[in-house]
């Protein structure tokens, strides 16, 4: 995110200072971005941090680990509700939801999506191919109070920004939300359960 001049502030919340130290030691090419003047690092539990925020963020990226142990709180209704409150009216939250090819991950994805969908008026799942992740196929959640990721996508406005990205394109954006039939079925069952 620090590559983009339009980004004014980044709050990085990490519970364990050793994670930041390890990144600086072993991933210096990426970790050097933490020294950017716009980056503010907070060493605390993200659930506690986000509880204190209201109408503050345009974007929340939840790059959590697995939904158990220290990160378990980042998969709760309380956390998603706090993220909802921390976002501005036009804010967006994205989060990792795992791989659908492993039973535990698929169950966690369903649970996470159900909790987000019960909190945000707009909640979608999108996909990406990430060779270094398990199965090389990963799911993410998109949640917003206002914007639908496809219906409100303005490709002309994005392209007019003339931002150089390594992966993202407006065409890929739309395609990422078109899921395989088995995933659509999993999510449809969840949404029907929410409506009851």
Q: What residue ranges belong to the model's regions?
A:
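Flexible, active-site-adjacent loop/turn segments at secondary-structure boundaries
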Residues: 25, 32, 72-73, 131, ...
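SAM/dcSAM-binding transferase cores
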Residues: 135-196
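Conserved Class I S-adenosyl-L-methionine
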Residues: 80-84, 106-129, 141
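Short, solvent-exposed coil/turn elements at secondary-structure transition points
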Residues: 47, 99, 129-131, 146
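Conserved beta-strand signature within the Rossmann-like core of class I S-adenosyl-L-methionine
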Residues: 90-97
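The AdoMet/dcAdoMet-binding core of the Class I SAM-like
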Residues: 1-90, 103-109
């Amino acid at each position: 995110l620090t590559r983009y001049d339009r980004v004014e502030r980044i709050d990085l919340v990490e519970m364990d200072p050793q994670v930041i130290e390890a990144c600086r030691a072993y991933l210096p090419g990426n970790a050097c971005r933490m020294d950017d003047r716009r980056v503010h690092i907070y060493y605390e539990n993200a659930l506690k941090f986000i509880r204190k925020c209201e109408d503050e963020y345009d974007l929340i990226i939840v790059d959590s680990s697995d939904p158990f142990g220290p990160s378990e709180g980042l998969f709760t209704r309380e956390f998603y509700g706090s993220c909802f409150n921390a976002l501005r009216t036009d804010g967006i939250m994205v989060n990792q939801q795992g791989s659908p090819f492993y039973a535990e991950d698929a169950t966690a994805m369903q649970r996470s999506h159900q909790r987000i969908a019960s909190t945000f008026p707009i909640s979608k799942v999108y996909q990406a191919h990430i060779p270094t992740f398990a199965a090389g196929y990963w799911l993410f959640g998109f949640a917003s109070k206002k914007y639908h990721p496809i219906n409100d996508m303005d490709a002309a406005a994005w392209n007019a920004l003339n931002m150089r990205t390594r992966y993202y394109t407006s065409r890929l954006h739309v395609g990422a939300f078109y899921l395989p039939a088995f995933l659509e079925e999993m999510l449809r069952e969840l949404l029907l359960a929410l409506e009851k």
